[in-house]
């Protein structure tokens, strides 16, 4: 045998990356032979899982397409049909005794080859798509294991790497055949009937040995690449959905982040359509073929393709309802619904709009085709949405949190963190970001609120105290605020911008904990006497507390500490009204002025509205996050919001655009806060009231 042949016979193909490796580079401790590179990349603790996933993917994509079904048992005559190169490789391997194989393993190797009853016509790289899967899955059918394939959700690179580390306990003898001499399918373990998660060992048993007898339907596609939206098992779909959901959440985050400024810059027809549709969200949708599959549309946006000026409507759908799984297209959610309904993972849907129905009014049973509401002419903004077709927004009490809340809440936290720690990007987690300033929308749109983004409302509704005063919620959300107006009488406090506050306060979580402790110990004379309105610790306000503003002991007697807004849009907003008479009552991030130089400190005077100078109820008022002296009662805040127009950015009620700490970007109310403030004229008991 020539040196080249010997070298070739000594090489073993890695089950995951499908690359020929020398014996010393292979590991047989797993159900399949894998190279050290794959194991190192994936980690020995999860290699089995990756192998199972690869096995499932290969099987589900019928990588045996065009090959003969393989023997039904270990003794089937398939082995007689093996390619001569395979037989030669086996002989060479047996003599070389590669990979510390003993006699038993060598015997099993022959058995393993028998189970690969593949046609001899196909060579290793004859599969157009199987030549090199991004995931390292060579498109080889694998024993039927339903282990959740994490690979499905990973990028091609990660998948390929995962292949490197997916070497389940494989019988060494079987994989010792040089990969370049074996048909591609021979390099992979045969499909088996083992239950999901059961380790598959090549040639271990009759079930495995007959592995390649998988029906062509299960492994005949020959497409080594698994479609991004297709999974062979529920677990795979879940895994894939997680990755897709993460990507969709990123799209949603980007969409909401620059929504106002971007919408204002779009053509009027596009802007009007978006505002109209947004005002109708959220609304329920269902799959036309299975009415039990429900989702909900909660946001809209317009996207233009590169190089084109035309805009196309983009909608964000949550499916199933309340799951926080986001789809950024109708076709994507329709495809998922189709898979859930028909269990057909290979078919794609051309257009989701003709497979989805929406309910015009919740509970009416009036379901209409989504394609009728959003025909192509509307989706490309050639025509306006028919007013008679618009659904009425409905927020299911059973799942009040919209996915957009995942973006808005973190936004406040990020802003606070960014301001408190100069350099912080505010991206404390996916979706957490700092709100960008955006031009004010046309006043004509002022009457329309983006109710679709009711995430803010939902967040408020989750607040323990039922943040009635949306103003406080605004502050709590850390929405950017406008420049501070002149101090009102009774507000001798300094107007030093929060920027001046040192950024060396505690971390967001530490600040939150400190505030919690402070609030628990605060002794505001008004506590428990807020006129029946419980303290407004909304979850948003709590989030605000995460801001890095240092929290001081709530103990300044007779004084209400203004939340020192160390961070732009920090949580200090007066969702928690600064207790006028004592320690920060519910003050989110109220900082003891003594602890923070330059942080505004309220004088012992009563809290008064900056606009009307009326005395403020100590726990319910709107606090500008940037200027401590800017405090507003709800009526004045409502008037300001209405005057500015709730559809666009609504800045500080003072009429100024108070910049966030450490930046020139003004803060603005979030839509949920606006909705809360405008929800109703709640009579709030004033301190002076009997």
From Swiss-Prot:
Pfam families in the cross-refs: IRF-2BP1_2, IRF-2BP1_2_M, zf-C3HC4_IRF-2BP1_2
Chief location of this protein within or outside the cell: nucleus
Coiled coil: 231-259
UniProt biased composition (Basic and acidic residues): 234-245, 254-263
Comp. bias intervals (Polar residues): 207-222
InterPro entries (alphabetical): I2BP1/2_C3HC4-RING_sf (IPR044882), Interferon_reg_fac2-bd1_2_Znf (IPR022750)
Chain intervals with Low complexity compositional bias: 463-480, 538-556
Keyword Zinc-finger: yes
Gene Ontology biological-process annotations: regulation of transcription by RNA polymerase II
Subcellular location as annotated: Nucleus
Region described as Disordered: spans on this chain: 59-87, 136-263, 418-564
Gene3D superfamilies, A to Z: Interferon regulatory factor 2-binding protein
SUPFAM superfamilies to which the protein is assigned, alphabetical: RING/U-box (SSF57850)
Similarity section: Belongs to the IRF2BP family.
Protein name: Interferon regulatory factor 2-binding protein-like B
Source species: Xenopus laevis (African clawed frog)
Gene designation per UniProt: irf2bpl-b
